[in-house]
A protein has these predicted regions:
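Intrinsically disordered, low-complexity regulatory regions
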Residues: 1-88
Length: 88
């Protein structure tokens, strides 16, 4: 059990309090759902969900953690690749 406690403490230091992160992420997703006018493919929706998750971590935690920004670019790239004919 100490391992999960350590992991949660490390994540908390990097990303902030989880309940606040959850509120931020869910509010971002609500905005997308409220204004979405077209049905998205599953990968597009999932990428947006994950991007909201990563933005929540950036806003709530360490905005200088490059990996969060890298992940956002990666999710967007996966969709762009599929749209351009390369399914990963």
């Amino acid at each position: 059990m100490a391992d999960i406690t350590e992991t949660l403490q490390e994540r908390g230091k990097r990303y902030g309090v989880f309940t606040r992160h959850a509120e931020i992420s869910q509010q971002l997703k609500e905005v997308i759902n409220q204004y979405q006018t077209k049905v998205l493919a599953a990968d597009q929706q999932e990428a947006l969900d994950m991007i909201c998750h990563k933005i929540g971590r950036i806003i709530n935690g360490d905005p200088d953690y490059a990996d969060s920004w890298h992940d956002i670019a990666g999710y967007a790239q996966l969709v762009a690749d599929r749209l351009n004919g390369t399914d990963r």
